[in-house]
């Protein structure tokens, strides 16, 4: 009887030992899976997903978006209301008009910083410019017979060059000191229909994509991190960060969920991971929106009287009416008369020096757009950087309202880029405002799921110890 009891005890100990081995093995497998998932997620970062870690900038503490937008003259609640009720509907209609639908751009690569990106490397590099005989006659100047386009990534990154028969009236050609890629009529420029090439996910990933944002941020982030930085030195970082956030928002809002079935939709997890979880990125998005809005409203007289002729009289009159509504809306003027106060900048002895420094840095960022290896990313990058450069030109190049009325000259392409950029930012602000609760619920659900899983593991271990203790 005693031997039987001893054997029974030994059998129980062996059974308990096996359970512990299985439990430890399961935990090890889970940990390995987590490490692999994190590694793969890191490897899959794209141009829209790069978080600017090179900057090591201090992240703001979590807070709700209430009160005045930092360095601006409007509060979040007013911005959201005006954007939803007034600006966004007007801008949606405006960018669909013939004048604002077409953008002239140099699409082929001419990277001045790293020569290896000037060559096609991936499987979708075969997109080429059409022969001259295939171009619509409305083009102001013919393109060269053959120009290979540098293209990286996937088919969804390809620019659709389809145009309809619209004519353009040329505007004054002037130099923009803030950009390196001015509107110059030459064989490298082509018109692109922006409605056929929406800003969305393209599959542009890897070292080339990460290097773009690293190069952009390295031009200005060190100026921002210093505790003693003045407001002028922080502006460029905030503008770039806000634009970066907007790009990420558009990719998350129109994402390729299933490549096999070509299923597109919202990726709210990406929205949270790349934008919402970092309050400073949301704040900088609002800052950039108000900065560009200030430039548009400051140029009210110029934009309101400009010619928007494309050969379609009805559409052209509609365009002019929409522009006037955007730049002089009474609700906007009453609630947010000065979205951003540029008059307080460039004061003191260092003012001119800081301004020249900012111009040089932004020109470098503008030149980096030629290094983008994804054709659609390059298109929207060039358009939005030109739009931001135009806003800087309006606010900082011509001093005073009187001088602005007499001395401001904008290229047609600058006006197209400026209004399309304002629309992109408006869409991003609206999407963040509308979808933040849902995205945060999803993120919270994932966190709760993870916590519940690990809690089950800990509970299982505790229960095993308790059972083992009772059996011993």
Swiss-Prot record:
Consult the record and explain the modifications the protein receives after translation.
N-glycosylated.
Q: Which domain of life is it from?
A: Eukaryota
Instruction: Say yes or no: keyword Transport present.
Output: yes
What is the residue range of the signal peptide feature? 1-37
GO BP terms: namely:
protein folding in endoplasmic reticulum
**EC annotation?**
1.8.4.-
Protein task: Essential oxidoreductase that oxidizes proteins in the endoplasmic reticulum to produce disulfide bonds. Acts by oxidizing directly PDI isomerase through a direct disulfide exchange. Does not act as a direct oxidant of folding substrate, but relies on PDI to transfer oxidizing equivalent. Does not oxidize all PDI related proteins, suggesting that it can discriminate between PDI and related proteins. Its reoxidation probably involves electron transfer to molecular oxygen via FAD. Acts independently of glutathione.
Give the quaternary structure: May function both as a monomer and a homodimer.
UniProt xrefs under InterPro entries: Ero1, ERO1-like_sf
The identity of this protein, by name, is Endoplasmic reticulum oxidoreductin-2
Query: Which PANTHER family does the record match to this protein?
Result: ERO1-LIKE PROTEIN (PTHR12613:SF0), ERO1-RELATED (PTHR12613)
Q: Name one GO molecular function term.
A: protein-disulfide reductase activity
Q: Give the UniProt entry's GO cellular component terms.
A: endoplasmic reticulum membrane
Topological relation to the membrane, as annotated: Peripheral membrane protein
Which SUPFAM superfamilies has this protein been placed in? Answer: ERO1-like
